[in-house]
């Protein structure tokens, strides 16, 4: 089998492996209580180029799209609106599983939140970022569903681009607001992508296509 064919056939598992290795590398540093250079650089970039009286309310607004209240409400709305209840159930179970996984990882690693600069107050542990991890899993799964089921190319790709921007913006907002390190957000994204590969494969096999 040629390398190109191997990559095409196993692309999702390659992505899972790369993201998982990246997450574990960050988690190891977090476990040893290290503040990484990327944490300092990430915050300096955001504080230098983004923080202002104009952008702070925007960051506060955007971060709500990764919060529990909004995601639960959106899940209920989608479950009601989507005719295929198996898909609706898969959206609900995705939110539940990723939330439990996030809390499990937080309690294992127990990284304190940043204290130097806070625009808003948050409780609980810092790594991996719950908003980032859950948003990547939730909106990432919606991106997958849109790609798979939406026929109109304009609607499909516009939705995918907007949701991708939203995921990144939620992650940036957590650093901006001073409640997470850069590595918290990156770690949340990486483990969530790995999780999504497994979740989508399992849901397709045991629920949607059953």
Regions found by a protein language model. Name each.
Residues 1-68, 107-109, 113-119:
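N-terminal transmembrane-helix/juxtamembrane module of multi-pass inner/ER membrane proteins
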Residues 2-11, 82-93, 158:
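Membrane-interface helix-loop-helix junctions at transmembrane boundaries of multi-pass membrane enzymes
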Residues 3, 7, 118-210:
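Membrane-embedded catalytic cores of phosphoryl/pyrophosphoryl-handling enzymes
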Residues 17-21, 72, 91, 95-99, ...:
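Alpha-helical transmembrane spans of integral membrane proteins, capturing the lipid-embedded, hydrophobic core
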Residues 21-26, 97-104, 165-174:
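Aromatic-anchored segments of alpha-helical transmembrane domains
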Residues 23, 27, 55, 101, ...:
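Alpha-helical membrane-inserting segments
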Residues 32-33, 83-84, 107-115, 179, ...:
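Transmembrane helix-loop junctions in multipass membrane proteins, especially transporters and channels
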Residues 36-37, 80-152:
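Membrane-interface loops
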């Amino acid at each position: 089998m040629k390398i190109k064919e191997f990559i095409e056939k196993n692309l999702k598992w390659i992505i899972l492996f790369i993201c998982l290795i990246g997450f574990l590398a960050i988690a190891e540093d977090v476990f040893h209580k290290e503040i990484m250079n990327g944490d300092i650089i990430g915050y300096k970039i955001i504080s230098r180029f983004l923080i202002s009286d104009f952008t702070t309310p925007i960051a506060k607004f955007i971060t709500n799209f990764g919060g529990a209240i909004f995601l639960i409400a959106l899940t209920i709305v989608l479950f009601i609106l989507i005719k295929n209840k198996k898909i609706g159930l898969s959206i609900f179970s995705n939110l539940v599983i990723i939330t439990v996984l996030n809390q499990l990882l937080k309690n294992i690693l127990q990284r304190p939140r940043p204290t130097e600069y806070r625009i808003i107050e948050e409780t609980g542990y810092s790594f991996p970022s719950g908003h980032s991890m859950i948003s990547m899993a939730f909106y990432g799964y919606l991106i997958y569903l849109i790609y798979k089921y939406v026929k109109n190319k304009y609607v499909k790709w516009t939705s995918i681009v907007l949701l991708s921007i939203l995921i990144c913006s939620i992650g940036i907002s957590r650093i901006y607001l001073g409640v997470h390190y850069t590595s918290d957000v990156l770690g949340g994204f990486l483990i969530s992508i790995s999780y999504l590969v497994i979740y989508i494969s399992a849901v397709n096999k045991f629920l949607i296509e059953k």
